[in-house]
């Protein structure tokens, strides 16, 4: 076995043969068998809990399977450690990068095999070798730079260079674009294509459908720890078929849409101007209506939400809520009026990562109960958190679990649970399902429709065309800081929405 590992696989397919993994009370993987070919990008798709991450941890040597083997080329493996996996030519690039921020780029790249002379690190040789590894991949990065001073996208390139320094034949990417800019994503896609064309086996895990169809050559779908199907040709696949395969039901069932009777005017916006809005914005939303906002990056949708939630002051225009004037000088004013925001970047603006799920749910409600006394307040908060966890179906081992360890979908449901603890009239959802798996998305959509049925006006900003068409009663389109069109649900299609969203030619 060790001899085979030391021979480092340099070619051939990656095969999973009957992989099973059992944790106490949970069968995480059940008889997983499939093949990923060299010279291809092979996607692993499935809802949270489908088994994708467990399989990658087995591939990387972090977990050991209860049964089954891996095969790379002609060699079979059952890795006992990450060191054995690395020696066999495997690199797993996790969402949370395994690098040391306090060390230089060169030290990170060559950690464990730094060149030395007379027992001391030969820094000149180390920087030269690091520069060679970065050449053509990230030429702008100085090997002497402290890793923590790089952007996340640049750090990811260092991780890839580290994998290439070990002559990795199998490279697995786990949600690699979750925190990257559009430019960094384009660069990463080009690098993945290059690695594929060099004959490597690339495994790719992502919730972002557009990336799967952009860069992948084959897809394997998992559900509840079981293999469902491998699509060997992307030409055999479309978005709807892939989603149906992942969740086991038709795409239209995912959105949970159902017609509702609207219950009169809620929020009216007239001639609104402010940071990010280039022309006066006017619209109204009804009680019980789901109003979608679609647009490309930089269209002004998030900036509009910041004004409506009191985060940014308007420079002109007026607001009315339930027919009464509404003045917003701060988020406190918006919350007091019942206008509540779930922000786009939930990790930075929506949650307190080191605090518990219960504490995050009770953040907004706590000021209303400080006069009840510590004992009563503590009891109310405990009961409220448990009630919202149950109502929102937040999957957590305990209300005291730090929220940072929950999936994106469960974090989002906890944020929604926070607002349900308070009087709500208008709910602003900015990219509510970004980075969330399909099953959790369906739960979020169900919550949206339930709130609308209860008379809440729900305004949703989304860059996902299928999503905004699937859940909205009516859709407004923004481009370059202005509203460029309005479509009812039965009028909307991808072509019309994109046409309205594209920047206009200015004379």
From Swiss-Prot:
It comes from Pseudomonas syringae pv. tomato (strain ATCC BAA-871 / DC3000). Residues 14-249, 249-505 form the ABC transporter domain. The gene is araG. Keywords: ATP-binding, Cell inner membrane, Cell membrane, Membrane, Nucleotide-binding, Repeat, Sugar transport, Translocase, Transport. InterPro entries: AAA+_ATPase, ABC_carbohydrate_import_ATPase, ABC_transporter-like_ATP-bd, ABC_transporter-like_CS, P-loop_NTPase. Signal peptide: none annotated. It is a peripheral membrane protein. GO terms for molecular function: ABC-type L-arabinose transporter activity; ATP binding; ATP hydrolysis activity. This is Arabinose import ATP-binding protein AraG. Pfam families: ABC_tran. The keyword Glycoprotein does not apply. Its main location: membrane. Gene3D superfamilies: P-loop containing nucleotide triphosphate hydrolases. SUPFAM superfamilies: P-loop containing nucleoside triphosphate hydrolases (SSF52540). The complex is composed of two ATP-binding proteins (AraG), two transmembrane proteins (AraH) and a solute-binding protein (AraF).
């Amino acid at each position: 076995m060790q001899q085979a590992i030391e021979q480092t696989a340099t070619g051939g397919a990656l095969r999973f043969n009957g992989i099973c993994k059992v944790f106490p009370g949970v069968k995480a993987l059940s008889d997983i068998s499939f093949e990923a070919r060299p010279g291809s990008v092979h996607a692993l798709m499935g809802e949270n809990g489908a088994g994708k991450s467990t399989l990658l941890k087995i591939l990387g040597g972090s977990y050991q399977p209860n049964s089954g083997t891996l095969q790379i080329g002609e060699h079979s493996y059952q890795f006992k450690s990450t060191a054995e996996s690395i020696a066999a030519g495997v690199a797993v690039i996790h969402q949370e990068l395994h690098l040391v921020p306090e060390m230089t780029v060169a030290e990170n790249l060559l950690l464990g095999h730094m060149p030395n002379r007379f027992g001391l690190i030969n820094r000149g040789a180390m920087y030269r070798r690091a520069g060679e590894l970065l050449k053509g991949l990230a030429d702008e990065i100085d090997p002497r730079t402290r890793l923590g001073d790089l952007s996340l996208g640049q750090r990811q390139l260092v991780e890839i260079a580290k994998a290439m320094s070990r002559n990795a034949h199998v490279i697995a990417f786990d949600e690699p674009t979750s925190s990257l800019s559009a430019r960094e994503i384009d660069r990463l896609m080009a690098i993945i294509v290059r690695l594929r064309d060099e004959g490597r086996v690339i495994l790719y895990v992502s919730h972002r459908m557009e990336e799967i169809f952009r860069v992948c050559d084959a897809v394997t779908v998992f559900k509840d720890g079981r293999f469902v199907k491998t699509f060997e040709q992307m030409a055999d696949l479309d978005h709807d078929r892939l989603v149906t395969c992942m969740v086991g039901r038709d795409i239209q069932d995912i959105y949970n849409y159902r017609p509702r009777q609207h219950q009169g005017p809620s929020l009216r916006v007239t001639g609104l101007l402010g940071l990010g809005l280039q022309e006066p914005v006017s619209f109204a939303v009804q009680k019980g209506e789901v109003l979608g906002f679609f647009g490309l990056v930089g269209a002004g949708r998030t900036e509009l939400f910041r004004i409506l939630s009191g985060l940014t002051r308007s420079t002109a225009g007026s607001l009315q809520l339930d027919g009464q004037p509404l003045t917003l000088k701060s988020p406190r004013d918006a919350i007091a009026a019942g206008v509540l925001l779930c922000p786009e970047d939930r990790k930075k603006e929506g949650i307190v990562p080191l605090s518990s799920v219960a504490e995050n749910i009770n953040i907004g409600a706590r000021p209303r109960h400080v006069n009840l006394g510590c004992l009563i307040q503590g009891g109310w908060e405990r009961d409220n958190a448990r009630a919202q966890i149950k109502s929102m179906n937040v999957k957590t081992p305990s209300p005291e679990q730090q929220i940072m360890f929950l999936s994106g979908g469960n974090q989002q449901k906890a944020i929604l649970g926070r607002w349900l603890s308070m009087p709500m009239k208008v709910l602003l959802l900015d990219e509510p399902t970004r980075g969330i798996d399909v099953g959790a998305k369906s739960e979020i959509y169900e919550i949206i429709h339930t709130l609308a049925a209860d008379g809440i006006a729900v305004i949703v900003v989304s860059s996902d065309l299928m999503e905004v068409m699937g859940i909205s009663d009516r859709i407004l389109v923004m481009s370059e800081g202005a509203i460029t069109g309005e479509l009812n649900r039965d009028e909307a299609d991808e072509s019309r929405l994109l046409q309205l969203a594209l920047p206009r030619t200015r004379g």
